[in-house]
Amino acid sequence: MGKIKKIQRKGPPATKRPPKAARTESTDSALGLDAHSDLEKPATSSDDGFEEPTPKPKPSKKTTTLPEPVSIIAQKKNKFRTDDAKNVKPPTLEEMKELRDTRNLFHSNLFKLQVKEMLEELQLKTKYTEYIDNWMESFTVFTQRLKDGLVEKSQLEVPLNVDKKISGFIFSKPTKEPQLIGAASTGTLLGPKIVVDVALEMPKDCLHKDDYLNLIYDQKRALYLTYVTNQMRSDPAYSQDKFAFNYHGNNPLKPVLELTPAAKHVSKHLQLRLFITAPQSTFKPGRFVPWNNNIRPTYYNDEWDEEEALPSTQHYNASVLFDLTLAQNQALLDKAFKGRRNFQDGLLLLKVWLRQRELDRGFTGFGSHILASFIVYLNQQRILHQSSSSYQVARTVWNQLANTDWTNGITLAPASGQTEQLSTIAGYYDVCFMDVSGQLNLCANVPLGVYQRVRAEAKLAVDLLNDMKLNSFPYIFMQKCPLYTRVDNILKITNYSSIQQMLVLHSKPQMKYDFASYGYPQLLQILTELLQKGLKQRVQAILPIETVSSAWPVESKAPIIGQAIQLGLILDPEHAYEVLDKGPSSNDDPEGSAEFRKFWGEKSNLRRFQDGSITEAVVWGTTKDAPSKKRLIVRQIVMHLLEHHLQLDSKDIQYIAAELDLVYQLSPWFKVSKVKTKLELQQDTDAEALSPNVIRCYDDLARQLHALDDLPLEIVSISSISPVSRYCEPMPVLPQARMMADHIHASHIQRVIIQLGQSGKWPNELSALRALKTAFLIEIGEKLKAQCRLNWSITSEGLLVLKRGFCFLLELAHNKELALLKQEVTERGVTKYVDNPESRALEQRHYILPKVSGALHSLHQSHSAYGPTVLIAKRWLATQLLDDGIWPPMATELLVAHLYQQRNAPQAIAAPQTGFMRLLHLLAHSDWNGELFLLNFNSSWQEQQIGDLEHSFRSDRQSYPPLALATSYDQQHAGRLWTTGESPSLRILSHVSRLARHALEMIETSLQSKDLRFVRPAQLFRGSSEGYDLVIQLKSDLVPNALSYDLGSPFVSFDQPNYLLPRAGKDPLAAIVHQLRSAYSDYAAFFYNPHGGKELAIMWRPPAVFAPKAFKVTELQACTLCDKGKVQVVRETLVEDFKVLLKDFYLRISTPEELKREQREHQNPKRYFNAKPQDNESCSKSKKRKLAKAAKVQAPLKRKSLIKSRPLKSLS
Amino acid sequence: MEEIEGYTVVPLRMSSDALHCHSVYMREHFIRLMDPNKPKGRTLFLLNIPPYVTEESLKGFFKRAGNVESVQFAAKPGKDETIKWYEGTNEPFSNVRPPFIFKVAYVVFQKSSSIGKALAVPSIDLFHSSGESTIKTGMELWHEESPNIWPTTTEESERAALAAKNSEADADGWVTVGKEGRNAGFEQKESVIGRLEKKRENDTKTKELKNFYTFQIRESKMQNIVEMRKKFEGG
């Protein structure tokens, strides 16, 4: 939807406000505010500010019609002017009406303005409408010039694949003029690619009355199309245009001509499609009722028992009827839509909505012509009024879609026209919506799953509109939600032989006749039935994901389509991961039991359960399995079913589920057996499965803390604020923290906030208070040691406690500290409390984070995919070299929480991988400038508050950070607490958007391609090495590797990993990078992978920063003297600084290209900065040795690693 | 010796073989309003000091020009910049550190004769004769930082801090009267004052009829419209 651009919030157009007009008695009565307007009722045709169905008197007219009370007003006006000239202007009738209706229909003016603006943008430019009109004129002339005659073999291929071809087709020239159909006719063309449909009717002469049988009609139709195409190509008016054939709606029986005009000004966005239809009277009316057979088994050389009734071909019949009834249907639509801007706009809105959801695609798509017909239907049923506004049209359609059931059939035909029993017809189709002729089912090809999906989406749209706490516009219209991001797992079968095998062995002959041997719908039916039966309530919906067939040049042969299938599975998280499928009891229902056994094959066993029942059952795992393993149960079942029933080998099938979950698994390099612990650990465990261990240990610690005796003050509350406690820590946390030489060493520390009971004796001075806090912590530490035998040590941040191999950092929170930090004394001696960055950080850590942590924890309890989604997202950001300093980790967590909390899909996400893809979508397509992400936990914010916040956000955008996040717990800091102007900065934000778009592109290509497998994690989870100016390689033995699955660095190949335990809470690399950023961010940007990355990538700021400039005392930072009294920043000097700061850590500095070249050539790596040829090798070596020596003295703990480093380097 | 606009420019070297060095711009410190901590004639003013340079290292270097009384940093030249720079860093139990950015330095010598000597140095060398840097960076720095950052034992400083609060009569015989005591008065807080003012306002306000006269009704309707406009059009 490139066409719908960001809708800027604009003030109301100036013209809208009428001039100061008469304030008549009627305005006063209008002020009575009788605010009742039922939205669903068509009778109240209230105007909501959209284009009026009937022209309205202009306000200017109004003033002229009511000239009398002017003299009175003159006085009054003056009176009001004294107040506030702008706002207190007497209202006009129109304004009153508009204001009131806006209030009744929308929560805010914003939605109205946005919709209005979108519709304005969707309006077709006049150059297109003019072009279409001219084209139609010339085409009509062209068709009149056509001559009758026998169709010889033309140089064009007939765009149809049939087994038995007919010969001797005689072309007769059309007797009726070609007509615009579909969107072009109803005036609802939608960009960015405008497709204009034109129908040309074959005259009756071309067809015989027996042509209904065995695809003869379709062949004649195709021949007719070919002939017309041929003639057009030789006509000078069209010879420049681009001709191609395509299948309409992926239906191989419906070839259409796609014509891209050569005219420059339209060729980019305009396309014309030519349909061939036939007059309705060609065949006998009852010929194509659903139960008739029009393709005989003999056509496919099949035997058919004479006695048996011929199988019905309802889908084929509908395909022919589509052509026959087209004119009549179009006439009906035209009648309803022509000249009614409100209906047209309503349909446009619905079309946008449908297209963003990709539900209108392909053979099984819920096309927009169904929606158009439905609007007519609602109008007929008097549910939609002629004068309903476009918003009401859309809303009513959604409401009716959600609340009606078409499976029993609805019909457009008048009572007299509907000759056959509706329920009988409905029995032949999944969904039934009869057209005006009473013969064609408009929804013939729509499977039940797709229809249910449309209904669910419609229901969601209504819910979103009703949600007063939300501006639903972006969710309904702007957000692109491709189907693959809405399904949890995807089954993809593209293997030719498997497809053929299924069609030949498992498709019923009746289905073959019904779909005229088109493979796709048959496959769909076979697979859907089987999976639905096997997965039962594990799955909420099975949806076909179709790719639209691509056009082919008219000279080449028509391709065979439908040789691949992709199904999306939406899982029900409540049932999908059950490990057991129980059959009927073998005693009570032996037949059912046998059938169950037959269905499941060897997997089914007779089992005795605890309640004494003995039944057949299938077991897919144990209840103790890790969640990531359980998520693969559905995959297991599907694979088994396909193998057992359809004899498909697992290598012929692609089942896309949990491929990316790999990234938070424990690295295979790390051997779990080396960890000394009482816990049972598996080698193939992951961060998600390990989190509960930490949480359990924390719970124990909390219990012990509560139970401590003799503390001067009671511990009131203990809360954990570490990501682990909300399942958001992407690194597997193993119990390996330990005491070494009086220091605690741990890879992670878990932060815990303690609050003590009230006491008035706390000092009123910051340092005294902090001293007392420290004393308290020491007291707690000593008590823990004495009573619970836990090791502890005190640091400047808090009390480190070691328990069962996990390390906790206890902090004391006290209100007074916060107050003292905020305290300021004004000149008058009055104490004021003002937020400052330090107090904000403290408040966030001590008071807000515990609450948000709790809320996110409970979010994970209700959506078990939340945690793992965050894990994947954090890993992804880390591998793109975005560390916590430039992208706050809480931003990731809250954005993912936003995805799970906002109901932007009818079903909750059950698979983390899907969650991650949706996050990528969010990152790639969000309008950061216009959107504030609000997490209204427990709905504790009121409408008014939300309104105020959004108002302030929009009117004062500059004061908010580029990415604005707010939760319901941080009201006074709303939008400014979790992110700042620097993290993430605007630059980083757009960088992330770009990365996300790139990742999505990769995912989409792999999904759409027939041959490619799903994207490998290594493709997504390894950053690009391009765009960086310098890479500082760090010594690999000084930086511990991440415990999670490492997919490699963008710069160098794998090295021997090390898993050294750093001192608890110390991350020297992060600290140095922080220093570098604070000192040098004006000149360079720094990137590294916080998950064990061993390179620091540097990007210089634009060259202007390094240009010579005049001497100014205040702007001398980092400047060296250059010629002519000017100064400039020299990059080499800065590099020297980096080296100083990274002393002992850096191995060498080079450009990424050099590094790559060296990696390729496996050269002996040069030790030092290459750009410095004078750097003499021996000197640097001796210096290095000295440094190593120094480091040894300074850091005895690192001795082992440093010694180890030498042979390591000599290896490379 | 290079000079620019009255500043002497010297390189700041971190090692004896350093090629690319930062330039430090120095001159005698002189402004009209002198700061007692930066006495006239004895203070050397240095511009563009790299972030990692410490007070001690500069002090150590400038010893060769004469005894150094103190070295102070600031983010930029200016009156209270030095105070701002060190704000909060000297308090016990505080994790506040001075910012890590390019800065200016004031070196105060004991004798004014040292200034000339200092301005004559060819380069500022921040390394020992052995070649080792006088500034700790990298691994050294991060390993040295011990968890016990406070100088005295915790209990002592705690006592000291608490003692500071309960001050008795000071040297001049003045006693600080706090909010303790019998007649403490109200707290001089913004919220308290605000509450009091509001109360007074409410008291002075007479009870008035709000929806009685026609003009009042008309005005309230007007107000209604204004609010609606604000809600649906404004923003």
Swiss-Prot record, chain A:
It holds the Pfam family Nrap_D4. GO terms for biological process: ribosomal small subunit biogenesis; rRNA processing; tRNA export from nucleus. Residues 1-72, 1156-1212 are annotated as: Disordered. GO terms for cellular component: condensed nuclear chromosome; CURI complex; small-subunit processome; UTP-C complex. InterPro entries: NOL6/Upt22, Nrap_D1, Nrap_D2, Nrap_D3, Nrap_D4, Nrap_D5, Nrap_D6. Part of the small subunit (SSU) processome, composed of more than 70 proteins and the RNA chaperone small nucleolar RNA (snoRNA) U3. This is Nucleolar protein 6.
